[in-house]
Regions:
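Active-site mouth loops of central-metabolism enzymes
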Residues: 22-37, 95-104, 140-142, 208-221, ...
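Hydrophobic faces of well-ordered beta-strands that scaffold small-molecule active sites
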Residues: 7-11, 54-56, 90-96, 119-125, ...
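Alpha-helix-loop-beta-strand connector modules within alpha/beta enzyme cores
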Residues: 67-93, 256-258, 399-415
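Acidic (Asp/Glu)-rich catalytic clusters
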Residues: 2-4, 47-48, 80-88, 114-120, ...
Length: 437
């Protein structure tokens, strides 16, 4: 792996930033998840800071106990297409589930976004952890964890094949001869698999990036295997430097099985940060935002990870209850981590719920403190980059204005974009067309 590494940075649209109740903060845009002016402001701020991309999460099921900004938010591809017309170099990464969509449509949508943005599209691949999603797609039941990842693996094979339908110079458009395309540079997929039968070809040209960037969000064994085979980047979260280093080594070591080098997959840690005038100011900001979360809301938030389990039935100030293997078919890696930390630290249900609903930011303090933390994790091979979430509604602008210049001054982060595409920003080579001889 090359040691001439450059830190990569993205940010995530996550309501008003901060915790689930941050919309109540005096400085918050209460309708941030559905306010395009706010979304535009955030994207332009990210681009001014030369960040690699903006990331839009998504979900396919809500109920009355869902996180407030999940109840009312933009569909990712739609809002990213709008941002494509406003931004010029910022990458545009959107979430779409392989469990409740079709490969042909997905390939076409992200290829269109890549053309609209002139090469800045990214797809965050998820398999949908919530059982309720099935109810919105005329399905009798939600696929189990292992099956979802088998479907995702074949789905990605199909999508990548469709993206390779056309060679780069297939469209001749010769007005004199009347030749619109070179038929020798058109390739039909004709896929027949366990889950999908897709003929192809795709009805849009090969994209500026060859293929849009593929992100994968998931830290289970199945998720890591899927990323090692197909992804350009992985979005993950570990609580400690040691855990992040172990994850980093594990994922990178799996790439060789697919004839890939460690540099071909970037690992992004999702981190919350707070930038303050000093440590006391940063702590005050955290406590102000944390105080907005009620224990009732925290229990609902915790329950979402465990298939919307009702935690209100248990005593709050006794040890976290034994709930068996609940969560294995939803957010498996997250629920395993929650149960492990509760057991190892002897936490009560109240403590677990409040920590989950308003987690303490990973990097907090002055701008220099935050930059130090990011630098340590990067240089110690715990991450290739970070997806930044503001720990309060006021944080992200300060991160761009104060932390990014420090990272640039230290030679860790570039001062300008290296090109116009997300692939160029991430330092990833153009993929070969699998059908081209």
């Amino acid at each position: 792996m090359s040691e001439n590494r450059q830190l990569r940075l993205g940010t995530i649209l996550h309501g008003a930033s901060g915790n689930m109740s941050a919309w109540r903060h005096p400085a918050a845009q209460a309708d941030a998840s559905i306010n395009f002016a706010f979304v535009t402001q955030t994207a332009l701020k990210a681009e001014a800071g030369k960040l690699d991309f903006i990331f839009v999460a998504d979900g396919l099921y809500i109920n009355e106990k869902s996180i407030p900004h999940f109840l009312n938010r933009f569909e990712p591809l739609t809002v990213l297409s709008a941002l494509a017309a406003i931004t010029r170099q910022l990458g545009l990464v959107g979430t779409l589930s392989t469990s409740y969509s079709e490969p042909f449509t997905t390939a076409r949508q992200f290829a269109s976004l890549d053309h609209l943005s002139q090469g800045r599209a990214g797809w965050n691949v998820v398999t949908s952890p919530l059982e309720g999603s099935a109810k919105n797609f005329s399905r009798a039941q939600h696929p189990d964890h292992a099956l979802r990842y088998r479907i995702a693996d074949e789905y990605l094979q199909v999508v990548k094949g469709l993206w390779d339908s056309w060679e780069e110079d297939a469209f001749v458009r010769n007005k004199e001869t009347g030749q619109f395309f070179d038929k020798n540079k058109l390739h039909t997929l004709d896929h027949h698999g366990d889950f999908f039968k897709v003929a192809g070809p795709l009805n849009i040209a090969r994209t500026p990036q060859g293929r849009p960037i593929i992100f994968q969000a998931g830290a289970s064994d199945d998720g890591k295997k899927l990323a090692a085979r197909h992804a350009d980047a992985i979005f993950t979260h570990q609580d400690s430097l040691a855990e992040a280093q172990a994850f980093y080594r594990d994922v990178k070591s799996q790439l060789a099985a697919y004839q890939r080098s460690p540099d071909q997959l970037h690992i992004f840690q999702g981190v919350s940060v707070i930038v303050g005038d000093d440590a006391e100011d940063a702590e005050r900001q955290y406590q102000t935002t944390a105080a907005l979360v009620s224990i009732e809301d925290a229990l609902n938030y915790l329950g979402r990870y465990f298939e919307h389990h009702d935690f209100s039935q248990y005593p709050l100030d006794e040890p976290f209850p034994d709930i068996g293997d609940l969560g294995q078919n939803s957010f498996r890696s997250t629920t395993d981590e929650i149960k492990r930390h509760a057991r190892e630290r002897g936490l009560t249900l109240r403590q677990v719920a409040l920590e989950a609903a308003s987690p303490r930011p990973r990097f907090t303090g002055t701008a220099s403190d935050v930059a130090d933390g990011l630098q340590l994790w990067f240089e110690q091979h715990a991450a290739d980059g970070f997806i930044i979430q503001g720990g309060t509604p006021e944080t992200f602008p300060r991160f761009v204005d104060e932390v990014v210049p420090l990272l640039q001054a230290r030679g860790l982060f570039r001062r300008d974009y290296p090109g116009t595409t997300l692939r160029e920003s991430l330092g990833l080579a153009l993929p070969a067309n699998q059908f081209q001889k």
